[in-house]
């Protein structure tokens, strides 16, 4: 009797694990697409899309502390809009990993960021370890926290 219960319990657990795998795979694919969409929007200065993905009240911990922590507020939108009017800016992930745990998505990796002042053509390149935390809310992934940690000092590129 005890043996039968153990076998049934194991079968139930195995069935649950097998059935939950497609949902995890779908969540992982959605997380990757959302994160890639965020950086595409960021790299093209599409602040509307950036602030659709960035959750109101989200925390940004920049490496250089040149900007305040940003939320989806009028001040944050205005600051970044002004920044993109005067700079060309893009970020590239070199090695990125994704993990989904329930309704929480984790993205971490190595990132290179380039910023060029449009008026002068001078620029800098930054090298970071970046971690972004997403939360799935109403079927959509939203970034709630991002932290950049510099790997080496910034480099003048022009």
Regions found by a protein language model. Name each.
Residues 98-106, 121, 134-140:
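A short, structured loop/turn motif at beta-sheet edges
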Residues 103-115, 128:
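A short hydrophobic beta-strand element
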Residues 86, 114-124, 152:
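Short, cysteine-centered beta-strand-loop-beta hairpins and adjacent loop/turn segments enriched
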Residues 54, 111-113, 147-150:
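Short beta-strand segments enriched in hydrophobic/aromatic residues
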Residues 127-154:
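Short beta-strand edge/turn micro-motifs at domain boundaries
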Residues 28-30, 47-102, 122-125:
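A solvent-exposed, acidic/Ser-Thr-rich amphipathic alpha-helical stretch
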Residues 1-11:
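Bacterial N-terminal signal peptides that target proteins for export
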